[in-house]
């Protein structure tokens, strides 16, 4: 908790519109993180959802209930044809039938961070650390960057899948990570709320 408070204090500001970004999908984890950051830690989060190709009615209902309870929320729908193409190639090349969406829940969120000048991004838990996986970040390291995302979560297939998709830059906008220069200027910090519990 001490480490979390130190991180939050660095980003908490009455002068900024948003202190951090949280990712929400209509499930319990993102809602829990966003609620705690706003109410327990007095942060002003911008909740972001990346729409998948298929949505469940329950997930949509839960997300609407969450937003209606008093949160600023941005719902992004990346080009759905591009999503289908990336999902198909991701399935054949990487074994992930939802690979396009997996890319977008990282790349689109980071694009929002750059566009809104919000350097702190929270995901709920780190499946790689919680359930076993790529341990390069290390169990004692809470904050990470794009290299960890493209390695651990996208299993080093990100560039290959985007190239094989043969899609236009416009179609790929929400699927491409911001440039290294943009991220360096922002001083991006990505973390998981679960790391601090």
Q: What are the residue ranges of the model-derived segments?
A:
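Hydrophobic positions on the alpha1 helix immediately C-terminal to the Walker A/P-loop
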Residues: 32-33
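Short, glycine-rich nucleotide/cofactor-binding loops
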Residues: 21-29
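Nucleotide-activated chemistry modules centered on ATP-dependent adenylation/adenylyltransferase
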Residues: 1-19, 36-197
């Amino acid at each position: 908790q001490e480490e979390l408070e130190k991180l939050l204090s660095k980003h908490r500001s009455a002068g900024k519109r948003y202190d951090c970004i949280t990712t929400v999908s209509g499930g319990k984890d993102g809602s829990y993180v966003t609620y705690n950051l706003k109410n327990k830690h007095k942060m002003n989060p911008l909740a972001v959802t990346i729409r998948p190709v298929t949505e469940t009615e329950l997930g949509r209902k839960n997300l609407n209930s969450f937003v209606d309870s008093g949160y600023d929320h941005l719902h992004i729908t990346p080009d759905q044809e591009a999503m289908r193409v990336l999902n198909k190639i991701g399935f054949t090349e990487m074994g992930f039938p939802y690979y396009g969406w997996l890319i977008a829940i990282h790349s689109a969120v980071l694009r929002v961070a750059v566009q809104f000048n919000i350097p702190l991004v929270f995901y709920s838990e780190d499946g790689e650390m919680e359930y076993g996986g790529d341990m390069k970040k290390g169990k004692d390291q809470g904050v990470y960057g794009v290299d960890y995302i493209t390695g651990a979560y996208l299993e080093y297939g990100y560039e290959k899948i985007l190239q094989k998709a043969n899609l236009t830059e416009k179609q790929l906008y929400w699927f491409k990570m911001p440039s290294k220069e943009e991220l360096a200027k922002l001083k991006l910090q990505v973390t998981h709320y679960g790391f601090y519990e």
